[in-house]
A protein has these predicted regions:
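Short helix-loop capping/hinge segments that flank enzyme active sites or metal/cofactor-binding pockets
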Residues: 67-87, 240-245, 301-353, 411-421
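A short helix-breaking turn/cap at a secondary-structure junction
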Residues: 182-266, 447-452
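Flexible, glycine/charged-enriched surface loops at secondary-structure junctions
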Residues: 38, 224-231, 274-287
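An N-terminal boundary/leader segment
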Residues: 1-48, 274-276, 451-452
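Glycine-rich, small-residue loops and helix-cap segments
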Residues: 25, 69, 75, 109, ...
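Acyltransferase
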Residues: 18-23, 52, 259-284, 314-320, ...
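Short glycine/serine-rich loop segments
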Residues: 99-218, 403, 408-416, 420-423
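Acidic/His- and Gly-rich active-site-bordering loop/insert found
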Residues: 47, 57-128
Length: 452
């Protein structure tokens, strides 16, 4: 993958430049895009102009931020002033909104080079786009953040950003070998996308420092979602620190795992124990057992909450005659719900969050897999637990609970299963995002990646 912060000093020294760095990204795109299909649109003219302006600032010794000159990809559900925002749907083909959403505006102010819009599933839900996995063209990149994950994994860009409601960021990052963060709920401003109560804006990158740098610039310049305190922590990510105690979560995803992935994860846990990390399992503490029980059914719970909250929008989209059958099924399920059904779902989510808080005295964080294994093949159908539809971009069973809980999590590319990347997911209590980067950094420096 292609990193940024570790070459930035060469911009200041004059031995490299943002424009030259951008051109290297474009060479990779020219080589790999015909197969990977990560991009909806590229704005090369504006990107080159932005890179040249960044170069002038470096020559003057006055970069706007540590990410000044960084080429970035924006998921095509986020509005951009200079490119269409199509939301993965023919309904909005060629739609120009003539404005930047909050995160795009923030990254431009930080000197980021917005290279293009990356592929998303339809309205960031279940119908896949054309993107393939950069490690295997016959495998899914995951979804809904397909293009962002694939572009980073292919080395086209050092970082990109997207949103997640169920598992649409962490899971594709796992499949494509990215580092990625889903911050605490509300920590980064979602801009116009505020209609879903568990929508998280997050970042994918080729390194942990690049990941945190982009997240920090969004937080510092755009702030949080309204009513939330925002992302805590300084500009530089936390120094490596050993997590002395970690709670091991199985979640409902464990039963979906293949044996190689289970064995590799268990081997990684043994490596942690050998380094002095105390691991706490559900059999060790009643509060962990209670928590594991409370988060069962999170996949269906997330579908219930999200489809109900999207009901009014899906009605409008259906009226165009261009809504996919996949989302018509989601709308049909939502139309069967009452307000009381929604209230009961929210109550269950609140109970899950209370159970999470009860774990705080036990450990610094939690650990599990980021996906039930490596990326499945394109077209593979995953049982959703509901007969009406199947998931088409992989199984979100390790991600739904973390989204419903609103906790921060980071995925690390520490496993290789059948020569394909698979992530490990580190999680913490609300607003421990910065500390979590220190735990993640220690793990990357200390643990040997495991192949199976």
């Amino acid at each position: 993958m292609r990193t940024f912060l570790d070459v930035r000093d060469s911009f200041l020294e004059g031995s490299d430049s943002p424009r030259d760095y951008l051109e290297r990204c474009l060479e990779c795109i020219d080589s790999r895009e015909p197969q990977v299909k990560a991009w909806v649109v590229l704005n090369l003219e504006n990107a080159r102009q932005a890179a040249d302006e960044s170069g002038k600032r470096y020559r003057q010794g006055k970069p706007l931020s540590v990410i000044d000159g960084m080429p970035l990809g924006s998921k095509d559900v986020l509005q951009t002033l200079d490119m269409p925002t199509e939301l993965g749907s023919p309904i909005f083909k060629g739609r120009e909104t003539n404005m930047d959403t909050a995160s795009v505006n923030a990254l431009r102010l930080a000197g980021g080079v917005i290279l293009g819009k990356t592929v998303t599933t339809e309205f960031a839900f279940v119908k896949p786009g054309p993107t393939t996995n950069p490690f295997d063209p016959q495998a899914t990149p995951g979804g809904s953040s397909s293009g962002t994950s694939a572009a980073v994994g292919a080395g086209m860009i050092p970082a990109g950003w997207r949103n997640q409601v169920v598992g649409s960021g962490i899971r594709p990052a796992s499949y494509c070998g990215n580092f990625a963060i889903k911050p605490t709920i509300g920590a980064l401003h979602n801009g116009e996308g505020l209609s879903l109560s568990q929508l998280h804006l997050g970042v994918h990158a080729a390194s942990l420092p690049d990941m945190w740098a982009v997240a920090y610039q969004i937080a510092n310049r755009a702030g949080s979602d309204p009513g939330y305190p925002g992302l805590y922590g300084p500009e530089k990510m936390c120094d490596p620190q050993i997590p002395r105690r970690l709670i091991v979560l199985k979640t409902e995803g464990w039963d979906d795992c293949d044996e190689k992935t289970k064995d590799a994860f268990l081997e990684l846990l043994e490596s942690l124990k050998a380094q002095g990390v105390k691991l706490i399992h559900r059999s060790d503490d009643k509060s962990v057992e209670h928590f594991e029980t409370s988060i069962l059914g999170s996949v269906i719970l997330c579908r219930i909450i999200c489809s109900y909250e999207m009901r009014w929008l899906l009605r409008n989209y259906k009226a165009t005659g261009l809504l996919s059958e996949d989302l018509k099924q989601w709308l049909d399920l939502a139309e069967e719900m009452s307000l009381q059904d929604y209230r009961e779902a929210l109550q269950k989510r609140d109970e899950m969050r209370k159970a999470l808080q009860a774990l705080s005295p036990l450990a610094e964080g939690l650990i599990t897999l980021s996906s039930p294994g490596p990326a499945p093949s394109l077209g593979h159908l995953v049982d959703s637990g509901e007969p009406e539809f199947a998931y088409k971009t992989g199984n979100p069973s390790f991600n739904a609970a973390t989204s419903a809980l609103g906790l921060p999590c980071i995925t690390l590319p520490l496993l290789g299963i059948d020569r394909m990347p698979t992530g490990i997911q580190l999680m913490g209590q609300h607003h421990t995002d910065w500390n979590l980067t220190g735990d993640a950094s220690w793990m990357m420096q200390t643990l040997k990646p495991i192949s199976a």
